[in-house]
């Protein structure tokens, strides 16, 4: 499955324990999608378009009205990436 770079970044943040929280208007339409890492930082690559494409591909899901998290299908389609918490130049 083809996944764009912003989608990959969002999925990696979700795989490390992050979540996507939505803001809706009075009609129930999505205004913004905020991807928060497990440390509480916001990911700027996560837009409404990225959220909708991940949801359409069933790579993320919400359970019992909670925030959106990565699914097993999302984990299976995620490409391996080194943990980006420590840069290679730091060693």
Curated annotation (Swiss-Prot):
Species the sequence originates in: Caulobacter vibrioides (strain NA1000 / CB15N)
Protein name in UniProt: UPF0386 protein CCNA_00226
NCBIfam families the record matches: PRK13687.1
InterPro entries: YjhX_toxin
Similarity comment text for this entry: Belongs to the UPF0386 family.
